[in-house]
Amino acid sequence: MEGMAQHPVPRTVEEVFSDYKGRRAGLIKALTTDVEKFYQLVDPEKENLCLYGFPNETWEVNLPVEEVPPELPEPALGINFARDGMQEKDWLSLVAVHSDSWLLAVAFYFGARFGFGKNDRKRLFQMINDLPTVFELATGTAKQSKDQLTAHNNGSNSKYKSSGKSRQSESQTKGVKMSAPVKEEVDSGEEEEEDDDEQGATCGACGDNYGTDEFWICCDMCEKWFHGKCVKITPAKAEHIKQYKCPGCSIKKPRIG
């Protein structure tokens, strides 16, 4: 495949992990921020289609490679045929599961090809396992709920960054969904616990962890949290949004037929 030939072959554990992260980021984009475009490309009327992720964090829907056996393990074949026969959420979850399987297959293909020993394989798996899966991010089951991102940037004057003193109820926070999440019920003695929770918070688009110097926004529909840059929302733009819908929720509307 043309996209695969453009990237150097990883040979060390770190290089294989970097390759894995790049491909994973591309697949996450396809199933979250670019989901509308992805949905349209996966046409059931076309031949067997696959979803590919590349090391440069891009993705592509294409036919499988013609060479047999292929140079790399191939992703699930014919994902387009089930698109209209399932609920959209279930179909995307299925694609995400197969995407995770493919990512592992590619990573350990490189490991086998370049003779990784037991310790290298174990280290590679641990590095991979420390990241949320594509499935977890695409379905919102990764740790990123309002209960996990709490008061950040204490002392900040921004209305979109809640401080340790601004403990608000759910009804009060609805109007400032762009701020870091606030717990509904928080005791003063839980602040240390909150710091631990926020370490595991991840963006629903790119899968990266929360950074205190970054702007985040929460979807009012699915309650996933996203980097503003990942969903192309700035603090200024967010100020005029009454109810924010992420790209995935924006296309979830009744389909005829």
UniProtKB/Swiss-Prot annotation:
UniProt-recorded Gene Ontology molecular function terms: DNA binding; histone binding; transcription cis-regulatory region binding; transcription coregulator activity; zinc ion binding
Regulation: induction: By NaCl.
Subcellular localization(s) per the UniProt record: Nucleus
Chain residue ranges for the region called Disordered: 145-200
SUPFAM superfamilies: FYVE/PHD zinc finger
Keyword list, A-Z: Chromatin regulator, DNA-binding, Metal-binding, Nucleus, Transcription, Transcription regulation, Zinc, Zinc-finger
Zinc finger feature spans (PHD-type): 200-252
GO terms under cellular component: nucleus
Superkingdom in the source lineage: Eukaryota
Entry keyword annotation includes Acyltransferase: no
Cited Pfam families: Alfin, PHD
PROSITE patterns associated with the record: ZF_PHD_1, ZF_PHD_2
Record's compositionally biased regions (Low complexity): 153-166
Site (Histone H3K4me3 binding) residue list: Y210, W216, D220, W225
Tissue: Predominantly expressed in the roots.
Biased composition (Acidic residues): 187-199
A GO biological-process term: regulation of DNA-templated transcription
Keyword match Zinc-finger: yes
Alphabetized PANTHER family for the sequence: CPG BINDING PROTEIN, PHD FINGER PROTEIN ALFIN-LIKE 6
Recorded domain comment: The PHD-type zinc finger mediates the binding to H3K4me3.
Family designation: Belongs to the Alfin family.
Oligomeric and partner information: Interacts with H3K4me3 and to a lesser extent with H3K4me2.
Primary role: Histone-binding component that specifically recognizes H3 tails trimethylated on 'Lys-4' (H3K4me3), which mark transcription start sites of virtually all active genes. Transcriptional regulator that binds specifically to DNA sequences 5'-GNGGTG-3' or 5'-GTGGNG-3', including promoter elements of the salt-inducible PRP2 gene. Plays a role in salinity tolerance.
Protein name: PHD finger protein Alfin1
Gene behind this protein: ALFIN-1
